[in-house]
């Protein structure tokens, strides 16, 4: 599958001007008090205002997961564009799939002059804790008109939920990305996310 450049995939170059910070992955969070479990069957939900971009985004993430030896499916193969915004339809699709994990991923807007997080671990809002209602909330927020116009920086965020418990177990954010850079490809950042998930014990190593 052809790699997706940020500028092409998300159409944000005209909206945001920002610098590129070296290094693909910035911060991670792991559920405290619970030993990591390797997830072997995942569903990937990409969040985007454009259905075509969302499907391509999910496909690239799934391809990378399969390349790492993990069974994975794109949400668009289980849900119509209409149903992807309906929480009940999403819950039913996840339940029918038999998947043990769900990844929700999107480009998060950020203002670079905001206070630094102070380390390699980011603070996860309480709303993130449960897949439902988190999914509906983030879908509504990111797809709202003008969402990206309010920010001058982007970070790729990926959140892994245990499908059975519908609970967040791992969250990661990339370093600041430059959507206008021809050198910045979404596949590079996805690969870094998957590598970190594997290193943290949430994906099988073989």
Which stretches of residues belong to each language-model region?
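Bacterial N-terminal signal peptides that target proteins for export
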Residues: 1-10
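Bacterial N-terminal signal peptides
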Residues: 9-19
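C-terminal/domain-edge helix-coil "capping" segments
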Residues: 20-40, 49, 137-206
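Short acidic/polar alpha-helix capping motifs at helix-coil junctions
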Residues: 24-27, 53-58, 122
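N-terminal segment of the mature soluble domain
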Residues: 41, 45-118
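Surface-exposed short loop/turn segments
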Residues: 86-160
């Amino acid at each position: 599958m052809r790699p997706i450049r940020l500028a092409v995939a998300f159409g944000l170059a005209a909206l945001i001007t920002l610098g590129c910070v070296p290094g693909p992955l910035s911060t991670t969070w792991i559920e405290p008090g619970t030993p990591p479990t390797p997830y072997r069957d995942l569903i990937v939900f990409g969040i985007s205002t454009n259905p075509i971009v969302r499907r391509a985004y999910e496909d690239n993430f799934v391809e990378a997961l399969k390349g790492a030896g993990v069974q994975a499916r794109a949400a668009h193969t289980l849900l119509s564009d209409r149903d992807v915004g309906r929480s009940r339809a999403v819950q039913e699709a996840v339940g029918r799939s038999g998947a043990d994990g769900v990844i929700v991923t999107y480009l998060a807007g950020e203002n670079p002059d905001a206070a630094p997080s102070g380390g390699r671990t980011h603070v996860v809002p309480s709303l993130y804790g449960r897949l439902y209602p988190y999914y509906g909330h983030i879908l509504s927020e990111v797809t709202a008109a003008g969402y990206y116009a309010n920010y001058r920086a982007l970070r790729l965020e990926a959140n892994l939920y245990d499908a059975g418990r519908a609970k967040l177990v791992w969250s990661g954010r990339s370093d600041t990305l430059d959507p206008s850079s021809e050198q910045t490809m979404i596949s590079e950042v996805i690969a870094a996310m998957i590598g970190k998930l594997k290193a943290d014990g949430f994906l099988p190593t073989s």
